């Protein structure tokens, strides 16, 4: 009987070793996945730092004009607009959110504003 119990012990040890190997492999895969995700986040942050531009929730580039004021180019109902908007920091999420203070200019309005810039500059 001792030989059968020792073979059972060996079998149990073998099964336990295999389970540990599987757990180790699973943990390795999980840690590799976490590491890959961290690298992707770092890469995205680096790209943002290199370009010096933020992006809004729709993926549009945000050009900083001043303190929490940004210009973006976006499409709405098939037309492109230049949006100049003031942002605020949300208390709960600590994310930058657009405020109601802002203006959207069509391409024609944007072109008019650009043409008026020399005259406006003379007033300063």
Swiss-Prot record:
Q: Which GO terms describe its molecular function?
A: DNA binding; transcription coactivator activity
User: Which biological process annotations from GO are given for this protein?
Assistant: positive regulation of transcription initiation by RNA polymerase II; RNA polymerase II promoter clearance
Give the matching Gene3D superfamilies.
Transcriptional Coactivator Pc4, Chain A (2.30.31.10)
Which domain of life does the protein's organism represent?
Eukaryota
Which portions of the sequence form the region Disordered? 1-61
Pfam families reported in the protein's UniProt record: PC4
InterPro entries of this UniProt entry? Answer: PC4_C, ssDNA-bd_transcriptional_reg, Sub1/Tcp4-like
Cellular component annotations (GO), alphabetically ordered: nucleus; transcription regulator complex
Q: Which UniProt keywords apply?
A: Activator, DNA-binding, Nucleus, Transcription, Transcription regulation
Keyword Transcription attributed: yes
Compositional bias (Basic and acidic residues) spans? 11-21, 39-58
Q: Subcellular localization, per the record?
A: Nucleus
Summarizing the function annotation, the protein's role is: General coactivator that functions cooperatively with TAFs and mediates functional interactions between upstream activators and the general transcriptional machinery. Binds single-stranded DNA.
- Provide the family line: Belongs to the transcriptional coactivator PC4 family.
Q: What is this protein called?
A: Putative RNA polymerase II transcriptional coactivator
